[in-house]
UniProtKB/Swiss-Prot annotation:
InterPro entries: Ribosomal_bL20, RIBOSOMAL_L20_CS, Ribosomal_protein_bL20_C
Purpose: Binds directly to 23S ribosomal RNA and is necessary for the in vitro assembly process of the 50S ribosomal subunit. It is not involved in the protein synthesizing functions of that subunit.
GO molecular function: rRNA binding; structural constituent of ribosome
Protein name: Large ribosomal subunit protein bL20c
Gene: rpl20
Amino acid sequence: MTRIRRGYIARRRRTKIRLFASTFRGAHSRLTRTITQQKMRALVSTQRDRGRRKRDFRRLWITRINAVTRENRVSYSYSRLIHDLYKKRLLLNRKILAQIAISNRNCLDTISNEILK
């Protein structure tokens, strides 16, 4: 009986997984079973951290806006600024407000003064 040559499908799948894990350290980039386990863990972590990154940036923007608004007035805070923005129907998101607060504080002062009028 003649010898049957194996197909290429499994080898192609494993090389694809190895390319994904080529930057991992130690056995995580060499052994097929640990490569697949680490790939699963890596993909789970990236999906979880995508949502976490959104939360972290939103917290950072809120902190920056709050710091700048409290510098100017004693009783004025982030929550009052956002409330006044909604009352005046000014559509500025927190990312833009934080960039304005860092780069040009005078502009944020004028915005808050116009809102309070």
